[in-house]
A protein has these predicted regions:
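Polysaccharide-binding and catalytic clefts of secreted carbohydrate-active enzymes
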Residues: 2-172, 176-188, 192-197
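Carbohydrate-binding surfaces of carbohydrate-active enzymes
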Residues: 98, 171, 175-327
Length: 327
């Protein structure tokens, strides 16, 4: 973590993208997957990993960060000029003096904080490419994707990774959309506007239709209040996905888990294992509708308004001490 403490195993994403052993084992697994399933007639695409996120502050990552900076700046003089290091006596005189921003170390050098976020994106993409390489070697014509995310109940673009850069490395965009319908914080119309906006943004990442890789047919388990969709809401929200450029409406999860942290997350098949409840019936209805609207698959959408969203700029403004911002 950012206190340079080695964490115990647990939670999610408890791996290091820099670990040579982890990379080696992932390559072996993916090679075997490609060899076994690569020419199966049911294979449509490869889904790589799951919801990339997080950073690591281990010795491997620190060294990779220093190397990344050396490649970017070339000299310490250039780095100090970019980071304005002499202010507060932060001049770097050796590459080994540089660590990632830390809760127990440096955290006030604006350029360093910004470069760390850029590095995290680049390192994540590099790991994605390492995962993809054995698959592409065996199945060069099978597309690859990974599931992007949104941030928080407000459905803001995911903050921690530059999806604009990441999008160049996937064959198609897919993402996990979990709006908290019927919440007390905003109207259904306001939330629908947020859903529409972020769908438009993710469609624009590659200027082509995308996939909804995860959605819930009922409620989620991680909002403050997790309400089941009202009758008809699942159909309405599913059609909104299509109207904004999605070619799918996939679900997490198909069957509710018997235990652990997401046992109450919505699913197509509930704990009662029944096809008679309203949620299952509405999922079936959406499936029938998708069959009827096959003609819209792959449709282009012409945008009449252009907007710029820049992850670099967002990070920079958020980290600029004293910059006047409004919540």
């Amino acid at each position: 973590n950012d206190r340079f403490e080695k964490m115990h195993h647990g939670g999610r994403h408890n791996h290091c993208f820099s670990s040579p052993i982890y990379r080696e084992k992932v390559a072996i697994i993916n090679q075997k997957l490609a060899e076994r399933y690569g020419h199966h007639p049911a294979l449509l695409m490869w889904h790589i990993s799951n919801e990339y996120s997080g950073d690591c502050h281990c010795a491997y990552c620190q060294e990779n960060f220093r190397h990344w900076l050396q490649v970017k700046y070339g000299t310490l003089a250039a780095l100090n000029a970019a980071w304005w290091g002499p202010f507060w006596s932060h001049t770097i005189t050796d590459w080994s003096q540089i660590d990632a921003p830390s809760a127990i170390g440096e955290s006030m050098v604006h350029g360093q904080n910004l470069d760390w976020k850029r590095f995290v994106t680049d390192q994540t993409i590099d790991f994605f490419e390492a995962e993809t390489k054995p698959l592409k070697a065996v199945t060069p014509d099978v597309p690859v994707t990974t599931n992007f995310m949104a941030d928080t109940v407000d459905l803001l673009p995911f903050y921690s990774l530059d999806y604009g850069k990441f999008a160049k490395h996937v064959d198609l965009i897919s993402w996990d959309c979990y709006p908290a319908w019927h919440n007390d914080a905003m109207s259904t119309a306001d939330l629908a506007s947020k859903v529409g906006f972020i769908n438009d943004q993710y469609r624009s990442l590659k200027q082509q239709p995308f996939l909804i890789m995860e959605s819930t047919p009922s409620g989620v388990n991680w909002h403050d209040y997790n309400k089941t969709k009202r009758p008809g809401m699942h159909t309405l929200s599913s059609l909104q996905f299509l109207a904004h450029g999605s070619d799918s409406n996939l679900y997490f999860q198909r069957r509710k888990s018997r235990g652990s942290s997401e046992k109450f997350h919505g699913a197509v098949v509930d704990h009662d294992n029944s096809a008679d409840n309203r949620v299952f019936q509405e999922v079936a209805h959406v499936g029938e509708l998708l069959e009827k609207v096959q003609a819209v698959k792959g449709s282009d959408k012409v945008a009449r308004v252009g907007m710029i969203y820049d992850w670099d700029n967002n990070w920079a403004l958020d980290d600029a001490q004293g910059f006047q911002t409004q919540d």
